[in-house]
Every structure is written in structure tokens, then in C-alpha cells.
Amino acid sequence: MAYYSMPKASAELKRKEEDEVDSTLRFGFRLLCSTALHPLEYAKTLIQLGYEPIAPRPGRTLFGAKRMMLPNIFQYAAYIKSVDGFIGCFRGLSPKILGNVLSSYYAEKLSVVLVGKMSTRFDDPSFNWFEANLDDINEYMETKDGVVEAMPGGMLRKAVAHVCGVVISHPFHVISIRMMAQFIGREHMYDGLFGSIKEIWLHEGISGFFSGIIPRLWMDFCCLTITSGITYLVAKYLGANKTVCGHVNNIAHFSVTSVFYPYHVVSTCMAVHGSRLKAGNPPLMDYYVNWNDCYARLLLQRQHKRGSSFFFRAVASTPAKMNGAFAPYPELK
């Protein structure tokens, strides 16, 4: 028995090591892509904050309608480069990367403490339900008594790990956003990581590190739950294979994220709101009682989709008040 178990144990150990290497490579690739695309993320953040330094011009939408068109995301990033140079396009990158690294390392460990140790391969956080085939799902659903489980343990663990990751990374997320928001008022309060931590701690306390976390958690929870539910139902009741489930998951994720995108805008605004930055105070930003008030006002002003489009950025409506965040609007003739 020992002779036969040795090769099996060796193969299992080798497979585990390969999975760890693949996971590390995937994470490194994500960091590389995040670094390369940071200038676009920088521009998107400023757009979400409502800062439009370049005046719109008469143009046409994707469907040919005449509208006042704002510059696309690449033109916006080029404007940032013209002001702060190439290095300035990567402002806020270091805390974002640090938050991602800490989140990736500690989120899974913390989820094990909260939920408990995994007992089956389906409880493993690395097990991707989106890539599971119908046989995997049937294997999980069938118990000894033929009773269908109501709550997939693997999905619960994944949700807990995701929430832990957001909580761990959010203080660095706030610092990153505020570093980028300094571009609007040309301040230097958040130039370094330790200086930024001191600034938030002295003027806002511990709550300042978690500004805007509730709408972010709400958006992520809704996207994860709905996307996973759609993929699971398609795999279970339509008999879709792994490839089809992957396509369904991508389409569902894109659609659901688009629906809940306004909460992303709210989270970004609340991350800056209440700070000493000009971008987070009147007249550049309204005073909000809480994130619900922020959402309601953005929705009323038709500004809740700011930054959702990279191209064909049409002006939704003329701002109710010219607060200095907008360049003068020309007339459409």
C-alpha cells in the first residue's frame, strides 16, 4: 500500500507546486497590466470626481447624433502628461500596488480563520466555479443522501475572501485616489505613503482610511452574487460546458458591472469627500451627508455614469453651477 501511495502523494505535491507557480505568475501579470494601464485609471478617477479641464467640442455620438463631446480617455491622459510629465502619470500607483499585494496575501488566510479550514476541493478558494464543468457541479450537488445543498461552501468562502481583500486594500485605495485627486487643486498633502497616512490619521482618524468603502462593498457584493448565480444556473440547468460558462460569466460580469457602475463613482467621490483637498470640498464638490446622499445627487444631476465610457463622451447636461471643475462650454451650433 505504501508503494502505491508514494507516487500518488508525489504527483499531488507536484500539482500543488505548479498551481502555486501559476497563481504567482497570474498575480504578477495582473500587477504588470495594472502598472501599464495606470495613466488611464488616473484619468478615469479624475473624470469620476467631475474634473473636466478640457472644454467639450461639437461632435457626434456613436449613433451619429450631434452633441457636445468631451475628450476621450487617451486625450485626458495626454493632458495629465502635458502638465506633470511622464512620471506624473503614475501618481498613486505605489499605494495601489501595495494594497493589492497585501490583499492578495492576507485575504485568503483571513477567510480561513473566519470560515474555517477547507474540507473538500470545492471549498478551496483557488477552485474557480466559473471554469467548473457540469460534472464538477453535479459532484458537488450530490450528497450521500441525494440531498441538494442550499449554499455552496466554496462560493461562501470566495465571498468572504473578497470582502477581506477589499477591507485590507481599501486604506491604500483611499490614499491612491487622494494622491491622484491632488492634480485638481495642485496640492502636495499626499506626496508620500507615510505622509499620507499621517495626514489622514491626524485630520480624520481611523474612519478616514475607510471613506467610501460601503458603496464599494455593495457594488462588489452585487456583482459577485449576480454573476456567479447566472453562471451557476446556466451550467446546472442548461448543461453548458466549460467554454460556454466562461463566455456567459464574462458577459454577465460586464453587464452587471455596468448596471452597478454608479456605486463605483460614489465610492471614488466619498474617498475624497471630507479631506482637506480642494477636490473634496465646495465649490469643486458638493457637501454630502453620506454616500446615499452622494448617489442621489449624482443621479439627479445625471453625473452618476461619469467615466463609464472611454470614447464618445457626450456631455449629459449643462452643469447646474460653474464651480471651476469644468472648462467653459462653447455653444453648439
Predicted regions and their residues:
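Residue-level recognition of transmembrane alpha-helices
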Residues: G92-L93, A159, I213
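Selective transmembrane-helix segments that form parts of the transport pathway or gating/packing helices
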Residues: L93, I97-V101, Y105, R216-F221
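Conserved long hydrophobic alpha-helices within structured protein cores
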Residues: L37, E41-A43, S103-V115
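N-terminal signal-anchor/initial transmembrane insertion module
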Residues: M1-G99
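Alpha-helical membrane and juxtamembrane elements of multi-pass inner-membrane transport
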Residues: P71, I87, D191, S207-G208
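Flexible extramembrane linkers and terminal tails adjacent to transmembrane helices
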Residues: M1-G28, A55, L62, E108-S207, ...
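Interfacial aromatic "cap" segments that immediately flank transmembrane helices
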Residues: C89, G205-I214
